[in-house]
Amino acid sequence: MRAERLRLSEEQGQRILRLYHLYRLTIGLVLVLLISSELEDQVLKLVHPELFHVGSWCYLVFNILVALFLPPSRQLLPIFILALTDVLMLCGLFYAGGGVPSGIGSLLVVAVAIANILLRGRIGLVIAAAASLGLLYLTFFLSLSSPDATNHYVQAGGLGTLCFAAALVIQALVRRQEQTETLAEERAETVANLEELNALILQRMRTGILVVDSRQAILLANQAALGLLRQDDVQGASLGRHSPMLMHCMKQWRLNPSLRPPTLKVVPDGPTVQPSFISLNREDDQHVLIFLEDISQIAQQAQQMKLAGLGRLTAGIAHEIRNPLGAISHAAQLLQESEELDAPDRRLTQIIQDQSKRMNLVIENVLQLSRRRQAEPQQLDLKEWLQRFVDEYPGRLRNDSQLHLQLGAGDIQTRMDPHQLNQVLSNLVQNGLRYSAQAHGRGQVWLSLARDPESDLPVLEVIDDGPGVPADKLNNLFEPFFTTESKGTGLGLYLSRELCESNQARIDYRNREEGGGCFRITFAHPRKLS
């Protein structure tokens, strides 16, 4: 019995035990008040008044001491001893009170029932057996001294039967309650596990998910949606506060649910998304489930297919142009070697050669664009990669040009094809050094790596102190064949943008207030699938 414990939970067991103490204290107090009042002779027909008085006081004092000094325990032995003592003391009061007419037998039935909530199986039935035997034996002893007690055997037997019935019924009810609670706990655990799994799946989804109530307050947002909204936490906030365009789109959908929502940008500088709405009817409140599908990857795949077809066409055209262009350049070179040419004619042949070289460079860039291989993104530690890039770059620096590196705090990683990143960065650095040298005679470029404070995405800025780009030409900066130099091909920045997009990165340009230009590359999240 020492090794056995209560099957109830600790909280339930302690609560029932406290109620048991309170019940016994109440009974003891009522008995003491009854024997101390004038109602004793009217209510009780005591056979042994002095024994009943002493027993009532002992019962009250015993229960007070138990309530004050018995430590809470889940061991069965202390509870068994307490219940058995309680039954024996009530049996003594039953005898002193004159047996069945005293009404103490009913208190025994209640005591047995409460004890069997805490004690289960044969241990609980021992308490019922003790009470039943006590009732029968004490009724027998009373019949020896009081002839009227001989008529109480049936009632005493009935009370004993009630003790066993109460024990068995209570144990069955408690057992069923335990099974119900166990099943409820198992189901609650299953539901909790499913909720955790659903939350994990929801957070790992690349599709942004928002749940909005009828007041347009955001109830739930997964990590992808937070990234699209450029926020850390939007729960409880108004949808219109963070994305007025999405709010307007949802209102239009409420008016006409069959309308296909147009693509939009959730935030001004964010990617283009395709929203879709599903109504979640919840009685009087109507919730809306919003899916935000980033279509930049779909557009990127379509762009790659378009470029693949265009690349094959341009490669054929470039190849056809290259042969006659080579003949023109060769003829101009032979003509320039003639001794009969005067100075103006030599100048013309030089122009032919210079423009032929420029045209050949355009053809080379077009062929390079058409032969561009599929991106193979890798997990990159940008700090380590940039440090290696800067260490290896001095061999390509001219005169006293300088390349500076500024690294932000913490671990900064992304997924990108390292060869294509090298190609993009080399092009941007060369442009920056060239324009910086034109403005100051010495080229300087700064590479600054950090995390965007809003999106937490890795950001690399290529900064120069050159003249910058005229405001009226900013919109055309990344278009093919757009150039601000007579010797440029206009394909470098276009190719850089295409390489960034094929790696799910974004490149932007802005003029700095203090002068110069800044190309900003926003990389993809390191856990984003390619």
From Swiss-Prot:
Q: Where is the Histidine kinase domain?
A: 316-527
Subcellular localization(s) per the UniProt record: Cell inner membrane
Membrane topology classification: Multi-pass membrane protein
Residues bearing Phosphohistidine? Answer: H319
For this UniProt record, give its keywords in alphabetical order, as a comma-separated list.
ATP-binding, Cell inner membrane, Cell membrane, Kinase, Membrane, Nucleotide-binding, Phosphoprotein, Transferase, Transmembrane, Transmembrane helix, Two-component regulatory system
Q: What is its main location?
A: membrane
Origin: domain of life: Bacteria
User: So what does this thing catalyse?
Assistant: ATP + protein L-histidine = ADP + protein N-phospho-L-histidine
Question: Topological domain, Cytoplasmic: which ranges?
Answer: 175-530
Signal peptide location: none
Q: Which GO terms describe its biological process?
A: regulation of cell projection assembly
One term under GO cellular component? plasma membrane
Q: Null phenotype?
A: Deletion mutant results in changes in swimming, swarming and/or twitching motility associated with virulence in specific hosts.
Question: Which intervals hold domain PAS?
Answer: 196-260
- InterPro entries listed in its UniProt record: HATPase_C_sf, His_kinase_dom, HisK_dim/P_dom, HisK_dim/P_sf, PAS, Sig_transdc_His_kin-like_C
The keyword Transmembrane is annotated on this UniProt entry: yes
This entry's Enzyme Commission designation comes to 2.7.13.3
* TM region(s), chain numbering: 25-37, 57-70, 76-98, 101-119, 124-144, 156-174
Functional note: Member of the two-component regulatory system PilS/PilR that regulates the expression of multiple genes including the type IV pilus (T4P) major subunit PilA. Thereby, plays a major role in the regulation of multiple motility pathways. Functions as a membrane-associated protein kinase that phosphorylates PilR in response to environmental signals leading to activation of specific gene promoters including the pilin gene.
Domain observations: The linker domain is the critical region for polar localization.
SUBUNIT field: Interacts with PilA.
Name of the molecule in the record: Sensor protein kinase PilS
Upper lineage is:
Bacteria, Pseudomonadati, Pseudomonadota, Gammaproteobacteria, Pseudomonadales
What gene name does this entry carry?
pilS
